Amino acid sequence: MGIFIDKILIIMTSEICLTMTLPTKTSTLDVAAQCFLNSLVRETKDWRLTEYQPTQLIIPLGEQQALHFRVAYFSPTQHHRFEFPARLVTASGSHPVDFATLSRLIVDKLQHQLLLPATSCETFHQRVMESHAHTQQAIDARHDWAALREKALNFGEAEQALLVGHAFHPAPKSHEPFNQQEAERYLPDFAPHFPLRWFAVNKTQIAGESLHLNLQQRLTRFAAENAPQLLNELSDNQWLFPLHPWQGEYLLQQEWCQELVAKGLIKDLGEAGAPWLPTTSSRSLYCATSRDMIKFSLSVRLTNSVRTLSVKEVKRGMRLARLAQTDDWQTLQARFPTFRVMQEDGWAGLRDLHGNIMQESLFALRENLLVDQPQSQTNVLVSLTQAAPDGGDSLLVAAVKRLSDRLGITAQQAAHAWVDAYCHQVLKPLFTAEADYGLVLLAHQQNILVQMLGDLPVGLIYRDCQGSAFMPHAAGWLDTIGEAQAENVF
């Protein structure tokens, strides 16, 4: 069904709602405030919509005052659009309020209602305000973002197209303790590239696994591909160990790492080698010419948690990679030949002087399935569906419009064709893996890579194997690799 509301064309199918708007930036736009408000509307019930037009969202603050937001579009998928500024309505009248004021009023209300600690609420509000500022900084820096609508994007371009972040989070762009200079160098929002930080490490201080090569061979291959100028540092007892450059500097400030340096077990070789780009998660990096992507522990609070890996998580990747060698996996693959998983079939970390594996030093090696086709239209779903930072069409709508033009069909027909292909190419293999095999791939939009040809979905790549789990009926399958008691069975 397609209907017009003012300048908005809404195309609805059974699965996806596409909203096409004129790409005109207006003073009413605030995508960061929209994320905050949508998370509030989703998680609380103390609000209402007016029955009169134009529709208003009303959030009561007390008997004598309320916040009023003009609703541009109220979405069945909860991706609501609001016009700003909001208005504070009191018994004596109303006046516009900025985001700092409205967010403070809402936080104060929730603190009073739920009897929350004042210090926690203050920290929360500070993070909300920082995230709001970070979003605008990225939008201001990426003034060419609108040009991304004009063409099919490759993997790297789509990974760095995400400026808004989680659509249902009050502070989706938190990045403590990054300062602005660090944010611009290390976050995908600013489209940077940077080399890795390398260390020469005594092999006794390295823990890890690798499936098809032993760990020494895997790390050597990675170094040879990505920093060949450092190979003269290699020996049987000294291996090359890569780190995210920020994390490398962070580790050198930790006492356990300083002890290793003092004993000559670790030597800092500095930044070297090929440039890498941060993907949507920030801690996972991509180099088009490397056979591996790499996912690091990063001691930074991104959105709502410090992003350090655990041994349990990297072992989940190994578990899934071993399952991929079994007959049942080959059967699943034969049923869905365009469904693939970026296996995380290797990991490594540093040991302290006592032999403990230090989680803040961990990284997982992720198979780069795009090394032979880096320009293919393989796009992370969250970048396609995010609210456009300039208030115009999303990247998904842009793809549907290109599809419409190419096939000579209406936008509504193109939208139905896209969603139908998405259901067959993406949803069906994910649901079948769980229903028939007991394999759960926790496929939020950041982990779904939609492979497209001419803007139409033709395949699925799943990534982030730490988000894999199993249903009880997968026990027999897990037993074939000796993992019947795996910790991620539920």
Spell out what each predicted region is.
Residues G438-Q451:
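A short glycine-rich, hydrophobically flanked beta-strand micro-motif that places a catalytic Asp/Glu
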Residues S14-Q425, M452-F490:
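Nucleotide/phosphate-binding site architecture used for ATP/NTP-dependent chemistry
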Residues T432, D436:
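Protein kinase catalytic-loop region centered on the HRD/HxD motif
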Residues L427-F431:
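Short C-lobe core helix of eukaryotic-like protein kinase catalytic domains
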